[in-house]
């Protein structure tokens, strides 16, 4: 990844960074909640974004 990124690439990286976080705990406490964890969690070394 070059240090001088295009704006589009930077936007994609920023979105991926925001998505890559654990589930908020208050969501797990809701009634009839089926979600236990964030299934779309991504590790920087294991899974690459492909951009």
Curated annotation (Swiss-Prot):
SS bond list: none
GO terms of biological process kind: translation
GO MF assignments: structural constituent of ribosome
Subcellular location: Cytoplasm
Classification via InterPro entries: Ribosomal_eL39, Ribosomal_eL39_CS, Ribosomal_eL39_dom_sf
SUPFAM superfamilies in the cross-refs: Ribosomal protein L39e
Disordered: region residues: 1-23
Entry keywords, A to Z: Cytoplasm, Ribonucleoprotein, Ribosomal protein
Alphabetical list of Pfam families matching this protein: Ribosomal_L39
Keyword Ribonucleoprotein: yes
Cellular component GO terms, alphabetical: cytosolic large ribosomal subunit; preribosome
Stated family: Belongs to the eukaryotic ribosomal protein eL39 family.
The protein's role, per its UniProt record: Component of the ribosome, a large ribonucleoprotein complex responsible for the synthesis of proteins in the cell. The small ribosomal subunit (SSU) binds messenger RNAs (mRNAs) and translates the encoded message by selecting cognate aminoacyl-transfer RNA (tRNA) molecules. The large subunit (LSU) contains the ribosomal catalytic site termed the peptidyl transferase center (PTC), which catalyzes the formation of peptide bonds, thereby polymerizing the amino acids delivered by tRNAs into a polypeptide chain.
HAMAP family found in the cross-reference section: Ribosomal_eL39
PANTHER family from the UniProt entry: LARGE RIBOSOMAL SUBUNIT PROTEIN EL39, RIBOSOMAL PROTEIN L39E
Subunit and interaction comment: Component of the large ribosomal subunit. Mature ribosomes consist of a small (40S) and a large (60S) subunit. The 40S subunit contains about 32 different proteins and 1 molecule of RNA (18S). The 60S subunit contains 45 different proteins and 3 molecules of RNA (25S, 5.8S and 5S).
The protein's name in its UniProt record: Large ribosomal subunit protein eL39
Taxon lineage: Eukaryota, Fungi, Dikarya, Ascomycota, Saccharomycotina
């Amino acid at each position: 990844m070059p240090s001088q990124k295009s704006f589009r690439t930077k936007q994609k990286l920023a979105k991926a960074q925001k998505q890559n976080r654990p589930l908020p705990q208050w969501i797990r406490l809701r009634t009839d909640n089926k979600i236990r964890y964030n299934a779309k969690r991504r590790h920087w070394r294991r899974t690459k974004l492909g951009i």
